[in-house]
Swiss-Prot record:
The gene is DNAJA1. Gene3D superfamilies: DnaJ domain, Heat shock protein DnaJ, cysteine-rich domain, Urease metallochaperone UreE, N-terminal domain. CXXCXGXG motif repeats lie at residues 134-141, 150-157, 177-184, 193-200. It comes from the Eukaryota. Ubiquitous. Isoform 2 is highly expressed in testis and lung, but detected at low levels in thymus, prostate, colon and liver. Residues 395-397 form a propeptide. It is found in: Membrane; Cytoplasm; Microsome; Nucleus. Residues 6-68 form the J domain. This is DnaJ homolog subfamily A member 1. Residues 353-365 have a biased composition (Acidic residues). SMART domains: DnaJ (SM00271).
Length: 397
């Protein structure tokens, strides 16, 4: 039993979630609430990152489950990657802060795909916007020689203010320079490039052709190196496409295997059957259970080489795993004489010799709500004993 579930709730998972479920939840939420897409959701992005930072680490997760967020703070386990953006970059393969300083920002996009796409392979065209260096001013932001050091911050991009908080006590506050917006330089409005308005970069539409290979997985990344945002003086970043698989109506993927449930009737479970299955590449395969091969409720069987293609080895496939659910007939489906005949055909049942010490009881259908109602009524009864529900009496003279 975990002490608190706040981090799990932030990611939208249960406390017993696997690492794969945590990764999938973080991936979707981080892309949705990234500051580039939702500038007003910075706090939400921070909460998502902190939750994943703790729960993705086995030791931190154990500490959190036992003592909650307070245990993380007291246990000194809150260091992690240092910032939400570091966690994001490490997760999506963007490197760390030092790499970001040498390269332009990576652009991460989520691409929704079907299980059929991952099985057969597919090609998608993706239209997106990215920053490119302005070709009118060649990334200078204005005329040659128009760029000057910001006199407000002296080129640092940051301002430091001293705030007195008490006698002999001061607080030093560092903030982004409002004059140059943190760039450390400024351009006079009259000298700014008309195309980029002094920003040195412009937005450009880019159409990418994304090739989805057979056997790729949910969450797999496809990287277009050097196709990301450009910034003057930096190498271009990458465009990273993250595959997001939609749920399938029949099949569930487990590694290289496909899993499905199949309903069969009692007669099929006892006497055999043939069942067609439509595959993800539009073939129809037929599975057979021969008479005398009993299939019990919950039995699991498999078909070799009918699972997912193995990535980069597309001619090899996993297994198709089938769990059988046996549907039993309704009460009274046979007349007494036919039921007697059926009993003679089935294996003999074991008779119980009754003794005087035995009590006959009746077997009834289980009602899962009965215990809940009994528990509620019991609490109400105890409440009445301690707090009688008498009305307010009128005062008499």
């Amino acid at each position: 039993m975990v002490k608190e579930t706040t981090y799990y709730d932030v990611l939208g998972v249960k406390p017993n979630a696997t690492q794969e479920e945590l990764k999938k939840a973080y991936r979707k939420l981080a892309l949705k609430y990234h500051p580039d897409k939702n500038p007003n959701e910075g706090e939400k992005f921070k909460q998502i990152s902190q939750a994943y930072e703790v729960l993705s680490d086995a030791k931190k997760r154990e500490l959190y489950d036992k003592g909650g967020e307070q245990a993380i703070k007291e246990g000194g386990a809150g260091g992690g990657f240092g910032s939400p953006m570091d966690i994001f970059d490490m997760f999506f393969g963007g490197g760390g802060r030092m790499q970001r300083e040498r390269r332009g920002k990576n652009v991460v996009h989520q691409l929704s795909v079907t299980l059929e796409d991952l099985y057969n392979g597919a090609t998608r065209k993706l239209a997106l916007q990215k920053n490119v260096i302005c070709d009118k001013c060649e990334g200078r932001g204005g005329k040659k020689g128009a760029v000057e050091c910001c006199p407000n911050c002296r080129g640092t991009g940051m301002q430091i203010r001293i705030h007195q908080i008490g006698p002999g006590m001061v607080q030093q506050i560092q903030s982004v320079c409002m004059e140059c917006q943190g760039h450390g330089e400024r351009i006079s409005p009259k000298d700014r490039c008309k195309s980029c308005n002094g920003r040195k970069i412009v937005r450009e539409k880019k159409i990418l052709e994304v090739h989805i290979d057979k056997g790729m997985k949910d969450g797999q990344k496809i990287t277009f190196h050097g196709e990301g945002d450009q910034e003057p003086g930096l190498e271009p970043g990458d465009i990273i496409i993250v595959l997001d698989q939609k749920d399938h109506a029949v099949f569930t993927r487990r590694g290289e295997d496909l899993f499905m449930c199949m309903d069969i009737q009692l007669v099929e479970a006892l006497c055999g059957f043939q069942k067609p299955i439509s595959t993800l590449d539009n073939r129809t395969i037929v599975i057979t259970s021969h008479p005398g091969q009993i299939v019990k409720h919950g039995d699991i069987k498999c078909v070799l080489n009918e699972g997912m293609p193995i990535y980069r080895r597309p001619y090899e496939k996993g297994r198709l795993i089938i769990e059988f659910k046996v549907n039993f007939p309704e009460n009274g489906f046979l007349s007494p004489d036919k039921l007697s005949l059926l009993e003679k055909l089935l294996p003999e049942r074991k008779e119980v010799e009754e003794t005087d010490e035995m009590d006959q009881v009746e077997l009834v259908d289980f009602d899962p709500n009965q215990e809940r109602r009994r528990h509620y009524n019991g609490e109400a009864y105890e409440d009445d004993e301690h707090h009688p529900r008498g009305g307010v009496q009128c005062q008499t003279s």
